[in-house]
Structures are given as structure tokens and as C-alpha cells.
């Protein structure tokens, strides 16, 4: 077998049907669209969610709740991710940003207690979970709220 002799398997390359090319083709005249009507026209058909004039499901459902414009969006960091820092490091939001552990544009950083912390670190963040506070203290570090 040579590279120049490679061929696609049988049936892999199917020619597209050319619609409206005369009645002998089997796809002539109406080209598979049937006779007249909305679906036979170019651009014809109903929009997504249209139910023939009946009140659509999305509008039959009641409205609920509201968006709180004062909500704070915290970036979360797990304790196990802080093990990459050297012993005695002061972990601040700026340090986390430099290490690409959080993104820009968040209102604050919350440290969660998933995993184990193996080194004593001073962690400065906007919020801590209870478990995270305990584990940081148990490792000999400090949890400071900014």
C-alpha cells in the first residue's frame, strides 16, 4: 500500500443531491418541499418555540424570583490547591492571580476546606469556610479576613 493509492472506503463519500434539476432526477419541480404552503417557501417555517398561536410553554410558566444586583461573586480556592506554595508564604489575592488560580473580575476570594493543607501558610482572603479555618490553624498557619 502506498500513500498515493489511499482511497476512502466505499460509501464514505456520497454526492449531495442537486434539488430542482428536472423531473427525471426525482428531486425536480418541488424539490422535496411538497406543494405550496409556508414550508415550501424560501425562509419558510415557524420560529423556535412557536406553537401555532397557542400561548407557548415558556410564556405559560409563571415568573419567579429576581436578580439581586448587590450579589457578590467569590472565586473559590480549595485548601489542597494551596500546597503548591512554599512553607511560610503569605497567600494573598494578588499571589493567587499571579499563579492563575483565580481570574480577574471577581468580587472576592473564598477559601474552602476540600483536601488537606500540609504546610503552615498565612492566607489572606475575603471569606473562609469553617473547615478551611480549622485546617489552616491545624497546619500551623493563619487565616486572615481582608
Curated annotation (Swiss-Prot):
GO terms for molecular function: rRNA binding; structural constituent of ribosome. InterPro entries: Ribosomal_uL15, Ribosomal_uL15/eL18, Ribosomal_uL15/eL18_sf, Ribosomal_uL15_bac-type, Ribosomal_uL15_CS. The keyword Ribonucleoprotein applies. It comes from the Bacteria. One of its GO terms (biological process) is translation. It holds the Pfam family Ribosomal_L27A. GO terms for cellular component: cytosolic large ribosomal subunit. The keyword rRNA-binding applies. Residues 1-59 are annotated as: Disordered. Keywords: Ribonucleoprotein, Ribosomal protein, RNA-binding, rRNA-binding. Belongs to the universal ribosomal protein uL15 family. Binds to the 23S rRNA. Part of the 50S ribosomal subunit. This is Large ribosomal subunit protein uL15.
Amino acid at each position: 500500500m502506498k500513500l498515493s493509492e489511499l482511497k476512502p472506503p466505499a460509501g464514505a463519500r456520497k454526492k449531495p443531491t442537486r434539488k430542482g434539476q428536472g423531473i427525471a432526477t426525482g428531486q425536480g419541480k418541488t424539490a422535496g418541499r411538497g406543494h405550496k404552503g409556508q414550508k415550501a417557501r424560501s425562509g419558510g417555517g415557524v420560529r423556535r418555540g412557536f406553537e401555532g398561536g397557542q400561548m407557548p410553554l415558556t410564556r405559560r410558566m409563571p415568573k419567579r424570583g429576581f436578580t439581586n444586583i448587590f450579589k457578590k461573586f467569590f472565586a473559590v480556592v480549595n485548601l489542597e490547591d494551596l500546597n503548591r506554595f512554599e512553607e511560610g508564604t503569605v497567600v494573598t489575592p494578588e499571589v493567587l492571580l499571579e499563579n492563575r488560580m483565580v481570574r480577574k473580575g471577581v468580587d472576592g476570594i473564598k477559601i474552602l476546606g476540600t483536601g488537606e493543607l500540609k504546610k503552615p501558610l498565612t492566607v489572606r482572603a475575603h471569606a473562609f469556610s469553617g473547615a478551611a479555618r480549622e485546617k489552616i490553624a491545624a497546619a500551623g498557619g493563619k487565616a486572615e479576613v481582608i
